[in-house]
Amino acid sequence: MALGGKQSLGQMLIKSGKIDDEQLDKALEMLQENPGYIGSVFQELGYLNERELNQYLSQQLRIPTLSLGNYEIQKTVLELIPERIIRAQKILPVFKLNNTLNLAVTDPLDSTPINAARQATGMKVDPVIVTSTEIDNAIDLYYGMSTFVDVEDASETTNISDLFDETRIVELMDSIITQSQRYNSSDIHIEPRETDIRIRFRIDGRLQDFQALPKEISTALISRLKIMANMDIAETRRPQDGRILFKSKSGRLDLRVSTYPTLYGEKCVMRLLNISEALHSLVDLGFEEEVQGKYTDMLIGNQGIVLVSGPTGCGKTTTLYSTLNRLESPDINIVTIEDPIEYDLPNVNQAQVNIKSGVSFASALRSILRQDPDVIMVGEVRDEETVELAIRAALTGHLVFSTIHTNDAATGFTRLLNWKVEPFLISSTVKGILAQRLVRRICPECRVEYQATNQEKLQLGLEPEDDLISYLGGGCLACRNTGYKGRIGIYELLLMNQTISELVLNNAPGYRIRDAGVDAGMVTLLQDGLTKIRRGDTTTKEVYETLGAA
């Protein structure tokens, strides 16, 4: 239907060649089954994205569009509308001229937000169209990340606890988890303090403040969390662990919950696990073509051990899960022993360490060997017994994967030697060691090029006269002014060869094994980091802070 005598959106799309008559008929059929807005149907069918839809609406309604990422809003304009209305209506004042206010909206056909702004300001309101992502990011930038309405209207005599009944506590906890998904957080921290409760999200490896809540609701909030995680709400003096399966519009989310008693109450950390985030291709993880080729070649064959090395939180488990997903096939049996199981992998037999029941990595590995496995993943080799069992499993015709905590690939061999593993067992079973780190990606929306300073070059092992074109993020709405968005891995793959085998047999120190690897063509962590700096994936600062001085 045409709007106010104007050409209909469907007709506009056909005229521009965006869709054909058959696609329009399909959209109209869907609209008849589920009444709503035709533009949303076009989006759902993939005929156009939100920004394209806004452009057509702008032509149809003669309402301008605006890219908030390129626009800085004055503080006096932001103060014209209370924050609670901004958040509730998903609007943003952007410009004021005399008695007219330009208002950013996502749906110009919805009069409710426009009327709310008109009533709040007493001004004439002219809408401008923006995308949902832009307005969400702008609200984050100007008002902070929290979206839960505060208790600002409470009087001094109001009992804060009375404002947060059971229903409101449930809504609050659901809101915290839902928002953490939106920001692609890996962890949620709920921290009681003397005067309040601090909520923080770990985003791209860094903790960021999300919200401060009244300290009076601490007990109710943690109790709600314990109920969701099937934990003992009466136990407050001991640490507890639990699990939550949370359903949201974005899909099912698996949360691992840990509580810990502190001075001002129980602190809680939730680890967010999403299987779709774990099963990436090696290229998506950050493998360069040469390293990817060598790594996948190393997977050929039905025996040997592959170790992934690095500190906690550097993505080792994600690399192993992506590797197992690549190997998964109906004709092989993949078995894992983990602590804990971080993701539920399809067609993989996963088991968890349970020390109370006597199930350790070593004891589980003994049992796994009687399960006719082809591929075995041991979450971590922590002691001599486990590593010896893993190596003997590799000797008897199994492909074994595990992780180890060392600074680089070469010191992985020295760690094995320090565990008193026979050198000939190491040289005959270890196919290679992959060392890795995670660095933050530069936001593509605000990335700018510059020439690295002499100090930056020296920090990365270069000479001042060396050319190093670098990039950084200037900060924008898309990255919440951080300059970064997402993370990428940097890798160092040391493959076993005759020279390294002889060095291992002679108990050579790590630096000699490393030098032999470099002579054989190994790309070091620093070299891989420099590749990603020059390509604009990450910054000199990220690589230097992650790896240390060269």
Predicted regions: what they are:
Residues 1-266, 271-278, 282-284, 289-290, ...:
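N-terminal, intrinsically disordered, highly charged
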Residues 164-550:
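Short, flexible helix-loop junctions that flank or precede catalytic/ligand sites
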